[in-house]
Amino acid sequence: MGKVRAVCISEKRGTQKKNIESAVFVENWGIEGDAHAGNWHRQISLLSEETIAAFKARGAEVTDGAFGENLVVSGYDFTKFPIGTRFTCKDVVLELTQIGKECHHGCEIFQKMGECIMPTNGVFAKVLHGGKISVGAVSYTHLRAH
């Protein structure tokens, strides 16, 4: 079980996301108003609160959304879940589609810290069923049988 700690969006690509506390998740699209929403496999990005806290402990000065993550969730190590894992949070159902990503060359965090956690700890999902998620909501996992 996990708990949502931040819900973040950015209206333009290339800008840091901001915690808006609550958002509408649209089936096969992403978060309403987020620049990265669309009909593709990386509609939602997720990071664990624990991973962010460990990075901050090494001196990183980051806020929710700094890594481009849409959801910050406590209680999960997202890298331990296989592709296809489903997360439910109220009515919303997300399916894990990708683990990690290549950091872009202009990554401010990488330039300051010499590393970034998104390439190894960030995960991506698509929205299978829409609804609203707010900070404090509880999330459950469902491993898909292969």
Briefly describe each language-model feature range.
Residues 1-101, 132:
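Electropositive, beta-rich accessory/interaction domains or terminal extensions
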Residues 67-76, 116-126:
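Short, structured beta-strand/loop micro-motifs enriched in basic residues and often containing a Trp
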Residues 83, 99, 106-108, 135-138:
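A short secondary-structure junction signal
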Residues 88, 139-140:
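Hydrophobic beta-sheet segments that form the core/acyl-binding groove
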Residues 100, 106, 120-124:
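Short amphipathic alpha-helical surface patches that serve as generic macromolecular interface elements
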Residues 107-117:
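Short beta-strand-turn/beta-hairpin segments enriched in glycine/proline and small hydrophobics
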Residues 127-135, 139:
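Glycine- and charge-enriched low-complexity intrinsically disordered segments
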Residues 141-146:
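Conserved small/polar residues in nucleotide/adenosyl-binding loops
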